[in-house]
C-alpha cells in the first residue's frame, strides 16, 4: 500500500495571552549547554479521534500551554558580550512554535504495519513524514515544532521535534502532557512548570558525568550503522525478570538482552571492556524543583569484560546493570570522576564501536501518559537519523520505547549492516530458549 501524507503550510503558534512570567533571558545550565543545538523527535500515536477537530484542538491547547511554558516559545541565543553564554531569549515579536496540520490516507493499523516494515533511515520511509523536517538553520529560530497527522480511521499521530537545550525527555513529556490537559478542558496544567531553577543553573556538571562525556568524545566516530525496529519479546523479558536473583526491572532485562546479543557479534577481544552507557534522570539526585523541565540528564555506565558479557549467564548481566544503577548516587557525588571512570574501565583500549553501547530509555518518563481527550498514547516512536545527522556519531545507540503486548519496542542503531542479521538472530535465539 502506498501511504501519502499531505501537509498544510507551517504556521507559527504564539502564546494565547501574555506569559505568566516575564524573564527576558534564561541562562542555560551546564547540563543544558552540551545538547543546546541537538533536535530530538518523538512520535505519539493515538488510536481514537478527539470529539472536536483534532489538529485545531491541539493547536489551541498548544497556544494556551505556551502561556505557562513561555520559554519554549523563545530561541537559543549566545551573549557574546558576556562571556559567550548561551541562553533562551524570550523577547521579540517572532516568539512562538511551528505547527503543521497533516493527513494520511490510511488507518492506524496500516500505518503501523508500514512503519514496522520499513527501514527508518530509508528516504521513502513514512515515519519521516510524520514530523516536521527540522534543519540546522531552523534551530536558530525555534525551539519546538509540532505536526498533527490525522488518519482515515480517526486516529492521529503527534510528531514533536524540540531543541534538547530547552528540555530533556521527561521535561518535554511534561509539556506535552500539559497540552493534553488543556485540550481536555483543564484550566491550567496539573504540574506547575519550572524552567529557571537557581540550584540547577549554578550547579556544576557532576565530575563523573563530565568524565564520561570526555571519555566518549575521545572515541573514534562510528558510521554506516543499520537502523531497524526490533522487539524484545514479553516472554523473554518475563523469563529474565522472574529468573533473576532479585526480581529484575524491565529496563534491566531489555538492557541485558541488547548488551549481550550485540557484544556477541561485534567482540574481537574477550578481555577488552564492554561498556553499557545509559542516561539517567538526575532530578532527584541533584535536588531539582518539582516541575523543572530543563535538561537534567546524567550519563552512567555498567562495565564488564567483553567475554563475560557475550558468554556469561544473562542473569549475571542483570546483576551488573543493577549494581551500576545502585551506584548512581555515589557517582554523582564523587569528587574525582576521572579516577572513578579509570577504575571501572581499566587500562584496556576502548573502541567506540566494538566496546560501547548507549541505551536511552523513553519508557516511564511521561510519553505514555499523554491524553488529548481520546485516551492515552497507544505507541511511542522516534526517528533517530534526523537527530543523529546533526551530531558527532560516537556511540552505537538504542532507543527503548513503549512496551506492547508483544514486548518492548527498540529503535536499534547499534550495529553495522555487516553485523545486523547476526545481531537480530542472537535476540531470536535468546527468545527461543524461554
UniProtKB/Swiss-Prot annotation:
Listed GO MF terms: hydroxycinnamoyltransferase activity
Pfam families reported in the protein's UniProt record: Transferase
InterPro entries on file: CAT-like_dom_sf (IPR023213), Plant_acyltransferase (IPR050898)
Parts forming coiled coils: none
EC number assigned by the record: 2.3.1.-
Family: Belongs to the plant acyltransferase family.
PANTHER family hit by this protein: ACYL TRANSFERASE 15, ACYL TRANSFERASE 4
Misc remark: Plants over-expressing AT15 have significant reduction of ferulate in leaf cell wall.
Stated name of the protein: Acyl transferase 15
GN (gene name): AT15
Amino acid at each position: 500500500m502506498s501511504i501519502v501524507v499531505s501537509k498544510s503550510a507551517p504556521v507559527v503558534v504564539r502564546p494565547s495571552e501574555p506569559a505568566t512570567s516575564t524573564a527576558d533571558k534564561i541562562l542555560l545550565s551546564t547540563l543544558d549547554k552540551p545538547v543546546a543545538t541537538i533536535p530530538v523527535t518523538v512520535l505519539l500515536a493515538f488510536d481514537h479521534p478527539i470529539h472536536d477537530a483534532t489538529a485545531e484542538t491541539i493547536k489551541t491547547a498548544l497556544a494556551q500551554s505556551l502561556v505557562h511554558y513561555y520559554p519554549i516559545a523563545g530561541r537559543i541565543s549566545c551573549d557574546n558580550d558576556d562571556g559567550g553564554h548561551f541562553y533562551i531569549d524570550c523577547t521579540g515579536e517572532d516568539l512562538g512554535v511551528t505547527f503543521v496540520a497533516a493527513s494520511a490516507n490510511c488507518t492506524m493499523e496500516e500505518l503501523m504495519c508500514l512503519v514496522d516494515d520499513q527501514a527508518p533511515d530509508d528516504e521513502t520511509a513514512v515515519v519521516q513524514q510524520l514530523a516536521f523536517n527540522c534543519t540546522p538553520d531552523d534551530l536558530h529560530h525555534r525551539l519546538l515544532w509540532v505536526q498533527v497527522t490525522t488518519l482515515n480511521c480517526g486516529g492521529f499521530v503527534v510528531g514533536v521535534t524540540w531543541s534538547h537545550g530547552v528540555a530533556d525527555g521527561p521535561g518535554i513529556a511534561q509539556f506535552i502532557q500539559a497540552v493534553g490537559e488543556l485540550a481536555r478542558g483543564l484550566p491550567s496544567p496539573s504540574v506547575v512548570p519550572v524552567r529557571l531553577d537557581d540550584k540547577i543553573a549554578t550547579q556544576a556538571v557532576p565530575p563523573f558525568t563530565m568524565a564520561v562525556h570526555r571519555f566518549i568524545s575521545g572515541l573514534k566516530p562510528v558510521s554506516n550503522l543499520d537502523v531497524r525496529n526490533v522487539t524484545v519479546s514479553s516472554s523473554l523479558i518475563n523469563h529474565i525478570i522472574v529468573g533473576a536473583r532479585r526480581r529484575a526491572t524491565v529496563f534491566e532485562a531489555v538492557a541485558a538482552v541488547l548488551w549481550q546479543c550485540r557484544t556477541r557479534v561485534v567482540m574481537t577481544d574477550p578481555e577488552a571492556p564492554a561498556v553499557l552507557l545509559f542516561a539517567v534522570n538526575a532530578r532527584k539526585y541533584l535536588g531539582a524543583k518539582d516541575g523543572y523541565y530543563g535538561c537534567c540528564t546524567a550519563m552512567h555506565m555498567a562495565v564488564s569484560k567483553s567475554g563475560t558479557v557475550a558468554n556469561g549467564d544473562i542473569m549475571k548481566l542483570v546483576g551488573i546493570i543493577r549494581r551500576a544503577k545502585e551506584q548512581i548516587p555515589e557517582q554523582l557525588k564523587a569528587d574525582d570522576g576521572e579516577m572513578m571512570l579509570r577504575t571501572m574501565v581499566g587500562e584496556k583500549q576502548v573502541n567506540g564501536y566494538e566496546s560501547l553501547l548507549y541505551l536511552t530509555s523513553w519508557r516511564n518518563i511521561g510519553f505514555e501518559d499523554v491524553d488529548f481527550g481520546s485516551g492515552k498514547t497507544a505507541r511511542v516512536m522516534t526517528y533517530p537519523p534526523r537527530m543523529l545527522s546533526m551530531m558527532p556519531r560516537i556511540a552505537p545507540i538504542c532507543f527503548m520505547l513503549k512496551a506492547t503486548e508483544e514486548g518492548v519496542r527498540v529503535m536499534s542503531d547499534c550495529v553495522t549492516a555487516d553485523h545486523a542479521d547476526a545481531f537480530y538472530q542472537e535476540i531470536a535465539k535468546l527468545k527461543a530458549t524461554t
